[in-house]
From Swiss-Prot:
GO biological process assignments: lipid biosynthetic process; medium-chain fatty acid biosynthetic process
Enzyme Commission number: 3.1.2.14
Protein name: S-acyl fatty acid synthase thioesterase, medium chain
Modified residues (N-acetylmethionine): 1
Domain of life: Eukaryota
Keywords of this entry: Acetylation, Cytoplasm, Fatty acid biosynthesis, Fatty acid metabolism, Hydrolase, Lipid biosynthesis, Lipid metabolism
Subunit and partners: Interacts (via C-terminus) with FASN.
Compartment(s) where it occurs, according to its Swiss-Prot or TrEMBL record: Cytoplasm, Cytosol
Pfam families on file: Thioesterase
Outcome recorded upon mutating residue 101 to A: Loss of thioesterase activity
Effect on the protein upon substituting residue 263 to V: No effect on thioesterase activity
């Protein structure tokens, strides 16, 4: 096994954003962002969450404090970097993954890489707003490089999740578009075949907005020999922005992990 880097290394802190450290936490919850997203939204979860959890939000290259870095070329490059950053903080504590949309796929590939290289698995993976990676119903990602700025604006308004005042601010939109294009390119290249057997042994939970157009979240069950369940919450693709839904997710995750630790 490769030697883990120091838990306080700049590399680790660059990739993982932990705004609210909790040394007494029993579990570490690693959160993965949606396409075009940063780490701040999920890092803030750590302020109001069960005391048994410490939240670390993944910060991808090309945004926030990593603004000057080039974007990743594919999802495996992203996962490899995350695994390197994770190793120092998951050696002594149980951990789980939560990903929304694009982040669900990053969480999956990160889990598979951890298992392949280090024989480690999260206790649980929580996926949100994402079709199974091998599903024929997985939405086709538009080639954003072929869209005008105005077309991207309309696409974001239709999709939801990005505040309208930000989308209508031309300067903000021009900063955001490169992030979205980079992540959309990664998703577009991500091809995942249906496995002939379970790849993981952990439990998977799916969350979905009642008005989301995402289909076949149930297909995630094909990836694990563990249990699988789905929870539908009111809202669209970004249903988790609603405080009630966010609280439900955080409380559910805490209960799941506490029960997992007893088995």
């Amino acid at each position: 096994m490769e030697t883990a880097v120091n838990a306080k290394s700049p590399r680790n802190e660059k990739v993982l954003n932990c705004l609210y450290q909790n040394p007494d936490a029993v579990f570490k919850l690693i959160c993965f962002p949606w396409a075009g997203g940063g780490s701040i939204h999920f890092a803030k979860w750590g302020q109001k969450i069960n005391d048994s959890l410490e939240v670390h939000a993944v910060r991808l290259a090309g945004r926030e404090t990593r603004l000057g870095e080039p974007f990743a070329n594919d999802i495996y490059q992203i996962a490899d970097e995350i695994v390197t950053a994770l190793l120092p903080i998951i050696q002594d504590k149980a951990f789980a993954f939560f990903g929304h949309s694009f982040g669900s796929y990053i969480a999956l590939i990160t889990a598979l890489l951890l298992k392949e290289k280090y024989k480690m698995e999260p206790l649980h993976i929580f996926v949100s707003g994402a079709s199974a990676p091998h599903s024929t119903s997985r939405p086709q990602v538009p080639d954003l490089n072929e869209l005008t700025e105005e077309q991207v604006r309309h696409h974001l308004l239709d999709f939801g999740g990005t505040p309208k005042h930000l989308i209508e601010d031309q300067d903000v939109l021009r900063m955001f578009i490169p992030l979205l294009k980079a992540d959309a390119g990664v998703v577009k290249k991500f091809i995942f075949d249906k496995p002939s057997k379970a790849l993981l042994s952990l439990d998977i939970t799916g969350f979905l907005g009642s008005e989301d157009t995402i289909k076949d979240i149930e297909g995630w069950q094909d990836l694990t020999s563990g249990k699988f369940d789905v929870h539908m919450l009111p809202g669209d693709h970004f249903y988790l922005m609603k405080p009630d839904n966010e609280n439900f997710i955080k409380n559910y995750i805490a209960k799941c992990l506490e029960l997992s630790s007893l088995t």
